């Protein structure tokens, strides 16, 4: 009887741990005719979603930290990290994102026509004194040793020069673009 109880306890612990993280691999068409691989990790214990886009010089990592309320994105070809306060009206809840990814992976036909444009000004928005406790450890691990810029939601796409925007895969599907806010 003790063995059965011990077995059930171990089984329930493993089941809880297996539900803590869920990984989705998605392939979307790239601009050059090939496919772009995206790996999305949903961590229900940390309340985060980490999106890795594997696309050569356009590769990026984005963390949605629902516990602290921030989104950080690092385009790997640039030595910079971009951070924005999460707008819970514009960004789906973690469980909805998880459901969307499941449907995207299984149906491979979901898309959004709404876009959230994020702009930053590299001359004005550099964050020099960073309170990592505010942003949380997942974002700290992503952005600690590179310049960090504060982004803001642009209410109209005309506020940003769309030629300098990064929008790939899941970020594009969720309607998020990162754009430089400099107009010459």
From Swiss-Prot:
Domain spans labelled BRICHOS: 54-151
Annotated GO CC locations: basal part of cell; extracellular space
Gene Ontology biological process terms in this record: gene expression; inflammatory response; neutrophil activation involved in immune response; NLRP3 inflammasome complex assembly; regulation of cell population proliferation; response to bacterium; response to cortisol; response to stress
Coiled-coil residues: none
Keywords: Disulfide bond, Secreted, Signal
Signal peptide stretch: 1-20
Disulfide bonds: 81-143
Gene3D superfamilies, sorted: 3.30.390.150
Pfam entry (one): BRICHOS
InterPro entries: BRICHOS_dom, Gastrokine
Subunit structure: Heterodimer with TFF1; disulfide linked. Interacts with TFF2.
Annotated protein name in UniProt: Gastrokine-2
Organism of origin: Rattus norvegicus (Rat)
Taxonomic lineage: Eukaryota, Metazoa, Chordata, Craniata, Vertebrata
């Amino acid at each position: 009887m003790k063995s059965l109880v011990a077995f059930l306890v171990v089984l329930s612990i493993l089941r809880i741990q297996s539900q803590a993280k869920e990984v989705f691999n998605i392939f979307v068409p790239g601009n050059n005719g090939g496919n772009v691989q995206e790996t999305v990790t949903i961590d229900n214990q940390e309340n985060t979603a980490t999106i890795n886009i594997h696309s050569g010089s356009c590769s990026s990592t984005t963390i949605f930290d629902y516990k602290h309320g921030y989104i950080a994105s690092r385009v790997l070809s640039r030595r910079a990290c971009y951070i924005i306060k999460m707008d819970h009206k514009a960004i789906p809840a973690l469980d909805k994102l998880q459901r969307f990814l499941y449907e995207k992976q299984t149906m491979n036909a979901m898309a959004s026509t709404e876009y959230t444009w994020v702009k930053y000004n590299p001359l004005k928005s550099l964050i020099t004194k960073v309170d990592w406790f505010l942003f949380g450890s997942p974002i700290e691990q992503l952005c600690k040793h590179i310049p960090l810029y504060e982004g803001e939601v642009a209410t109209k796409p005309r506020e940003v020069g769309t030629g300098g925007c990064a929008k790939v895969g899941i970020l594009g599907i969720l309607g998020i673009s990162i754009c430089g806010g400099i107009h010459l």
